[in-house]
Amino acid sequence: KHFILRDKSRVAVTYASPVHFIKNGKWVENEPGLVQKNGRLHNTQGAFSASFALSGEDEGGSVIQWEGKSVSFRALGNRVGGTSQARVSNASPERTGLLSAQELMKSNSGTVSYDGVFTDASLEYKIAWNGIKEDIIISSRGGQYKYGFVYTLSHGLAMSLNSAGCGDKRQ
């Protein structure tokens, strides 16, 4: 896709996942977002179903479901008192006047953030058509750099470490 930025320059953007899909016989924009339903946040479009807790301390955490399988996860926060409420920003259908390609990419995803879920860090999940990107945002240098999560896998899924030492799903 090509976009015109505020300064009248043009940027060509390629995507790793579909940006259009057919709905009722017509091509429509894929604009992943989040809506609140049944006390949780749910993605509006995508190749999978995801739901997120309204609070970072909610034992329900986050759940991703696809093809009859599911993964649920939640942070083991070390927060002292208080709660971390979810903050949502959704994909923006209005893409004119963007300053940069980074703004463009951010405008094409739904995001849920939990500020202060850890004493010195926040969590942010960006929802795209084919996946979720988790970012741990550290608020101060020299703080804690170990963060714990609880995962629950279903239907024959198992976790293992890949060559980079990161969790990798296996069937």
Question: Model-predicted segments: where are they?
Answer:
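Residues that cap or anchor secondary-structure elements
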Residues: K1-Q171
